[in-house]
């Protein structure tokens, strides 16, 4: 199978997923092993986003681009991260490893390793093993 045929297949499959589930994941996003989509409806991942290994994305979450200001760019998400329902991560921010982002959180700042982030405006709480029992199917 040629590269062009493979790209056509990927685009057709992505189009079907977008229509059926509202799932919009850019083909230019870099995604590590073990991505888990919990209730995969209305999930958006912008182009050029970097997602590490063992990341859980839940219903309604958005990982998007900021087009202006100090945070212009896309997020980089580390390993073993859980992004809760209806959470939003925007701009050129780094989300560390072992981070749990609670439902309905809005993140537009860097988050260190081993943290739980919750609220809008979001607040960071340091916690060892933050994603224990929250990240599914480690690879």
Label for each model-derived stretch:
Residues 21, 27, 32-33, 38-47, ...:
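Left-handed beta-helix
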Residues 15-23:
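Metal-dependent phosphoesterase signature
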Residues 113-135:
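Conserved beta-strand-loop-alpha-helix hinge in the C-terminal portion
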Residues 1-5, 9:
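Single conserved hydrophobic/aromatic residue that forms the stacking wall/gate
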Residues 10-15, 37-38:
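Short juxtamembrane and helix-loop transition motifs at transmembrane-helix boundaries
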Residues 137-139:
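Alpha-helical subdomain
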């Amino acid at each position: 199978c040629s590269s062009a045929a493979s790209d056509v297949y990927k685009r057709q499959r992505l189009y079907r997923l977008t229509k059926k589930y509202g799932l919009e994941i850019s083909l230019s996003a870099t995604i590590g092993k073990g991505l888990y989509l919990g209730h995969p409806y209305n999930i958006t991942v912008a182009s050029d986003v970097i997602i590490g290994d063992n990341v859980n994305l839940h219903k309604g979450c958005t990982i998007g681009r900021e087009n202006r200001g100090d945070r212009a760019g896309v997020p980089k998400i580390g390993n073993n991260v859980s992004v809760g329902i209806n959470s939003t991560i925007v701009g050129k921010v780094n989300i560390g490893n072992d981070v749990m982002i609670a439902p309905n959180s809005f993140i537009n700042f860097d988050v260190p390793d081993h943290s739980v982030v919750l609220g809008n405006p979001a607040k960071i709480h340091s916690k060892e093993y933050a994603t224990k029992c929250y990240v599914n199917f480690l690879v």
